[in-house]
From Swiss-Prot:
Source organism per UniProt: Bifidobacterium longum (strain NCC 2705)
Function: One of the primary rRNA binding proteins, it binds directly to 16S rRNA where it nucleates assembly of the body of the 30S subunit.
BP terms from Gene Ontology: ribosomal small subunit biogenesis; translation
CDD domains the record matches: S4
UniProt keyword annotation of Magnesium present: no
The encoding gene: rpsD
Name this polypeptide is given: Small ribosomal subunit protein uS4
Keyword 4Fe-4S assigned: no
Phylogenetic lineage: Bacteria, Bacillati, Actinomycetota, Actinomycetes, Bifidobacteriales
Length: 208
Protein backbone atom coordinates (compact mmCIF):
# COMPACT_ATOMS: atom_id res chain seq x y z
CA UNK A 1 0.00 0.00 0.00
CA UNK A 2 1.39 3.41 -1.01
CA UNK A 3 1.47 6.41 1.32
CA UNK A 4 -1.32 8.05 -0.71
CA UNK A 5 -3.51 4.95 -0.45
CA UNK A 6 -2.80 4.68 3.27
CA UNK A 7 -3.70 8.34 3.76
CA UNK A 8 -6.99 7.97 1.88
CA UNK A 9 -7.83 4.88 3.89
CA UNK A 10 -7.24 6.75 7.15
CA UNK A 11 -9.48 9.60 5.99
CA UNK A 12 -12.32 7.21 5.15
CA UNK A 13 -11.87 5.39 8.44
CA UNK A 14 -11.90 8.70 10.32
CA UNK A 15 -15.21 9.68 8.74
CA UNK A 16 -16.71 6.24 9.36
CA UNK A 17 -15.75 6.27 13.05
CA UNK A 18 -16.44 9.96 13.64
CA UNK A 19 -12.91 10.81 14.82
CA UNK A 20 -9.87 12.34 13.13
CA UNK A 21 -7.00 9.84 13.07
CA UNK A 22 -4.44 12.00 11.24
CA UNK A 23 -3.87 15.74 10.67
CA UNK A 24 -5.08 15.37 7.07
CA UNK A 25 -8.16 13.52 8.24
CA UNK A 26 -8.82 16.33 10.71
CA UNK A 27 -8.88 18.91 7.91
CA UNK A 28 -11.20 16.85 5.73
CA UNK A 29 -13.38 15.75 8.64
CA UNK A 30 -14.02 19.40 9.53
CA UNK A 31 -15.40 19.94 6.02
CA UNK A 32 -17.33 16.66 5.78
CA UNK A 33 -18.15 15.45 9.33
CA UNK A 34 -20.26 12.50 8.21
CA UNK A 35 -19.71 8.93 7.11
CA UNK A 36 -18.27 8.31 3.62
CA UNK A 37 -20.41 7.10 0.77
CA UNK A 38 -23.38 8.35 -1.22
CA UNK A 39 -25.75 8.36 1.75
CA UNK A 40 -23.29 9.15 4.51
CA UNK A 41 -24.73 12.60 5.18
CA UNK A 42 -28.27 11.30 5.56
CA UNK A 43 -27.57 8.16 7.56
CA UNK A 44 -29.93 8.16 10.55
CA UNK A 45 -30.53 4.50 11.32
CA UNK A 46 -30.90 3.34 14.91
CA UNK A 47 -27.97 1.17 15.93
CA UNK A 48 -28.21 -1.86 18.17
CA UNK A 49 -26.38 -1.92 21.50
CA UNK A 50 -23.96 -4.41 19.96
CA UNK A 51 -23.21 -2.13 17.00
CA UNK A 52 -22.62 0.87 19.27
CA UNK A 53 -20.17 -1.07 21.41
CA UNK A 54 -18.42 -2.61 18.45
CA UNK A 55 -17.90 0.82 16.88
CA UNK A 56 -16.49 2.14 20.15
CA UNK A 57 -14.04 -0.76 20.19
CA UNK A 58 -13.06 0.04 16.61
CA UNK A 59 -12.55 3.70 17.54
CA UNK A 60 -10.13 2.73 20.30
CA UNK A 61 -8.26 0.33 18.02
CA UNK A 62 -7.93 2.96 15.32
CA UNK A 63 -6.63 5.66 17.65
CA UNK A 64 -3.81 3.43 18.87
CA UNK A 65 -3.33 1.79 15.47
CA UNK A 66 -3.37 -1.73 16.88
CA UNK A 67 -4.80 -5.06 15.80
CA UNK A 68 -7.85 -6.79 17.24
CA UNK A 69 -5.55 -9.36 18.83
CA UNK A 70 -3.52 -6.64 20.55
CA UNK A 71 -6.61 -4.87 21.86
CA UNK A 72 -8.12 -8.06 23.22
CA UNK A 73 -4.80 -8.87 24.91
CA UNK A 74 -4.88 -5.44 26.56
CA UNK A 75 -8.41 -6.15 27.79
CA UNK A 76 -7.45 -9.57 29.16
CA UNK A 77 -4.46 -8.04 30.94
CA UNK A 78 -6.66 -5.30 32.41
CA UNK A 79 -9.13 -7.85 33.83
CA UNK A 80 -6.28 -9.22 35.94
CA UNK A 81 -5.39 -5.77 37.26
CA UNK A 82 -6.81 -4.24 40.43
CA UNK A 83 -9.27 -1.40 39.88
CA UNK A 84 -11.57 -0.60 36.98
CA UNK A 85 -10.88 -2.70 33.90
CA UNK A 86 -11.47 0.13 31.44
CA UNK A 87 -9.10 2.52 33.18
CA UNK A 88 -6.41 -0.15 33.45
CA UNK A 89 -6.83 -0.92 29.76
CA UNK A 90 -6.43 2.73 28.73
CA UNK A 91 -3.39 3.42 30.90
CA UNK A 92 -1.72 0.25 29.62
CA UNK A 93 -2.27 1.16 25.95
CA UNK A 94 -1.07 4.70 26.58
CA UNK A 95 2.37 3.45 27.63
CA UNK A 96 3.08 1.69 24.33
CA UNK A 97 6.40 2.89 22.92
CA UNK A 98 4.98 3.91 19.54
CA UNK A 99 2.27 5.92 21.29
CA UNK A 100 4.78 7.76 23.48
CA UNK A 101 6.90 8.63 20.45
CA UNK A 102 3.77 10.29 19.07
CA UNK A 103 2.73 11.97 22.32
CA UNK A 104 6.24 13.43 22.71
CA UNK A 105 5.99 15.03 19.27
CA UNK A 106 8.77 12.99 17.66
CA UNK A 107 6.31 11.83 14.96
CA UNK A 108 3.28 13.32 13.22
CA UNK A 109 1.06 10.22 13.14
CA UNK A 110 0.77 6.87 14.88
CA UNK A 111 1.88 5.11 11.70
CA UNK A 112 5.01 7.25 11.46
CA UNK A 113 5.79 6.68 15.14
CA UNK A 114 5.51 2.92 14.67
CA UNK A 115 7.76 3.09 11.62
CA UNK A 116 10.41 4.98 13.60
CA UNK A 117 10.38 2.28 16.28
CA UNK A 118 10.48 -0.65 13.85
CA UNK A 119 13.33 0.94 11.90
CA UNK A 120 15.38 1.11 15.10
CA UNK A 121 15.57 4.88 15.50
CA UNK A 122 14.30 4.89 19.09
CA UNK A 123 16.19 4.21 22.32
CA UNK A 124 14.75 3.33 25.72
CA UNK A 125 17.22 4.05 28.50
CA UNK A 126 19.98 4.10 25.90
CA UNK A 127 19.10 0.77 24.27
CA UNK A 128 17.44 0.28 20.88
CA UNK A 129 13.90 -1.08 21.20
CA UNK A 130 12.20 -2.01 17.92
CA UNK A 131 8.89 -3.31 19.32
CA UNK A 132 6.08 -0.74 19.02
CA UNK A 133 4.11 -2.60 21.71
CA UNK A 134 6.90 -2.28 24.31
CA UNK A 135 5.45 -0.78 27.51
CA UNK A 136 7.51 2.09 28.88
CA UNK A 137 7.60 2.33 32.67
CA UNK A 138 7.74 5.41 34.91
CA UNK A 139 11.32 6.61 35.18
CA UNK A 140 12.33 5.33 31.75
CA UNK A 141 13.55 7.68 29.03
CA UNK A 142 12.92 7.46 25.30
CA UNK A 143 15.13 9.26 22.80
CA UNK A 144 15.87 9.33 19.10
CA UNK A 145 19.35 7.88 18.66
CA UNK A 146 22.07 10.40 17.81
CA UNK A 147 22.72 9.16 14.27
CA UNK A 148 19.02 9.32 13.40
CA UNK A 149 18.62 12.88 14.70
CA UNK A 150 20.35 14.17 11.55
CA UNK A 151 17.52 12.81 9.37
CA UNK A 152 15.04 15.34 7.99
CA UNK A 153 11.92 13.88 9.69
CA UNK A 154 13.56 14.17 13.09
CA UNK A 155 14.98 17.63 12.41
CA UNK A 156 11.43 18.73 11.60
CA UNK A 157 10.18 17.15 14.83
CA UNK A 158 12.91 18.83 16.90
CA UNK A 159 11.72 22.21 15.61
CA UNK A 160 8.30 21.54 17.14
CA UNK A 161 6.45 21.46 13.83
CA UNK A 162 4.22 18.54 14.84
CA UNK A 163 3.04 20.23 18.02
CA UNK A 164 0.58 22.31 16.00
CA UNK A 165 -1.38 19.21 14.98
CA UNK A 166 -0.97 17.02 18.07
CA UNK A 167 -2.68 17.18 21.47
CA UNK A 168 -0.79 18.99 24.24
CA UNK A 169 2.00 16.97 25.84
CA UNK A 170 0.37 14.99 28.68
CA UNK A 171 1.45 15.66 32.24
CA UNK A 172 3.14 12.29 32.69
CA UNK A 173 5.76 13.11 30.01
CA UNK A 174 8.74 15.43 30.47
CA UNK A 175 9.81 16.32 26.93
CA UNK A 176 12.97 18.01 25.67
CA UNK A 177 12.02 18.43 22.03
CA UNK A 178 15.31 19.95 20.72
CA UNK A 179 17.11 16.89 22.13
CA UNK A 180 14.32 14.54 20.97
CA UNK A 181 14.21 13.10 24.46
CA UNK A 182 11.29 12.35 26.79
CA UNK A 183 10.95 10.78 30.23
CA UNK A 184 7.86 9.07 31.61
CA UNK A 185 7.63 10.67 35.04
CA UNK A 186 4.63 8.72 36.35
CA UNK A 187 1.74 6.48 35.40
CA UNK A 188 -0.78 8.19 33.06
CA UNK A 189 -4.06 9.37 34.55
CA UNK A 190 -7.16 8.41 32.56
CA UNK A 191 -8.38 12.03 32.47
CA UNK A 192 -5.26 13.21 30.62
CA UNK A 193 -5.21 10.49 27.95
CA UNK A 194 -6.20 12.23 24.67
CA UNK A 195 -8.35 9.54 23.09
CA UNK A 196 -12.03 9.77 22.24
CA UNK A 197 -13.73 6.66 23.55
CA UNK A 198 -16.39 5.40 25.92
CA UNK A 199 -14.12 2.81 27.49
CA UNK A 200 -16.99 1.18 29.38
CA UNK A 201 -18.59 0.26 26.06
CA UNK A 202 -15.34 -1.41 25.00
CA UNK A 203 -15.24 -3.40 28.24
CA UNK A 204 -18.87 -4.42 27.77
CA UNK A 205 -18.16 -5.52 24.20
CA UNK A 206 -15.44 -7.94 25.31
CA UNK A 207 -17.27 -9.05 28.46
CA UNK A 208 -20.45 -10.08 26.62
Amino acid sequence: MTNVQRSRRQVRLSRALGIALTPKAQRIFEKRPYAPGEHGRDRRRTESDYAVRMREKQRLRAQYGISEKQLRAAYEKATRTAGQTGNAMLTDLETRLDNLVLRAGFARTTAQARQFVVHRHILVDGNIVDRPSYRVKPGQTIQVKAKSQTMVPFQIAAEGVHRDVLPAVPGYLDVNLPSLKATVTRKPEVEEIPVQVNIQYVVEFYAR
